[in-house]
């Protein structure tokens, strides 16, 4: 047989590092969700602004928007 499956699990204790101890408080809120919509409307507003920005850049690149006094030569 080319492969072998081992059913043994490691029996040692996990190592506790300094970095793990420092970062553990940041993970204490894992799984908790604030009730309600929270900042979702604000996020939607900024996503819409970003979409408008991207469309504007695309229109300038495609020369769909003519800019007076600015010579564009690609």
Swiss-Prot record:
Subcellular location: Plastid, Chloroplast thylakoid membrane
Keywords of the record: Chloroplast, Membrane, Phosphoprotein, Photosynthesis, Photosystem II, Plastid, Thylakoid, Transmembrane, Transmembrane helix
Record's keyword annotation contains Chloroplast: yes
InterPro entries: PSII_PsbH, PSII_PsbH_sf
Main location: plastid
Membrane topology classification: Single-pass membrane protein
Residue intervals passing through the bilayer: 41-61
Cellular component GO terms, alphabetical: chloroplast thylakoid membrane; photosystem II
Role summary: One of the components of the core complex of photosystem II (PSII), required for its stability and/or assembly. PSII is a light-driven water:plastoquinone oxidoreductase that uses light energy to abstract electrons from H(2)O, generating O(2) and a proton gradient subsequently used for ATP formation. It consists of a core antenna complex that captures photons, and an electron transfer chain that converts photonic excitation into a charge separation.
Protein's name in the database: Photosystem II reaction center protein H
Source species of the chain: Adiantum capillus-veneris (Maidenhair fern)
Lineage: Eukaryota, Viridiplantae, Streptophyta, Embryophyta, Tracheophyta
